[in-house]
Amino acid sequence: MGGLGAAALVLGSNGLISQRGGYGELVADPGGVIDLPPKFKYRIISEEGSTLSSGAPVPGDHDGMAASRSRGGTTILVRNHELRPSDTVTGNAPVPQKTPYDPAAPGGTTAIVVDNVGRREIRDYVTSSGTLNYCASEATPWGTWLTCEEDRTTHHGYVFEVNPRDPQNNLSRTPIRGMGIFSHEAVDIDPRSGLAYLTLLP
């Protein structure tokens, strides 16, 4: 994407995958953003360099994302910003802070509320701040977002839980110490057992 982060909805037919495998060959995108199979299309709904609903810049270094149904015919897309202090020196906007875990850390998460019919952004906002290097994450069966710091410096290297429907609350700034402090790559919750599976960066 030419070094720019973007959040996009990929839209396709509701048919089953062909038993011959896959959805077909990728078709080159004239816009140079993403190549998709026939009958698929995308729409960029948010992009680094644009502005949040608050007027602050959309932070960069987008990483893990998840979408969940919400009220009033909308979907909430939560995204990580895998930022560290050196990124802000090179021009990346930090995540705006209200109740940060660490005021010196530029990372965090934002959420985008999308209209299901028009597939357009209604608003976007910060859901957590003051973290380092958020990598992959997990949408939980109970509707929150577990997000992982791929970092191991003083006071960092934790998993945090974010509620996109109650942004920047105390939960979002409280590390889940029971999941350890190390360079977390990802977390996944088994919906049947409730067990959490953690991966780490070697």
PLM regions and their residue ranges:
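N-terminal export signals
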Residues: M1-S18
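N-terminal low-complexity or amphipathic/hydrophobic leaders
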Residues: I44-T88
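Conserved beta-propeller blade signature
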Residues: I76-V78, W145-L146, G194-T199
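Beta-rich, blade/repeat-based domains predominating
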Residues: A56-S68, G130-W142, I181-G194
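Extended, regular secondary-structure scaffolds
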Residues: V159-E161, E185-A186, D190-P202
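Blade-edge beta-strand/turn elements of extracellular beta-propeller
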Residues: D29-S50, G55-A56, V114-S128, F160-S183
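Well-ordered mid-protein domain cores that form the structural environment of catalytic cofactors
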Residues: L83-R173
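N-terminal pre-domain segments of enzymes
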Residues: Q19-V33
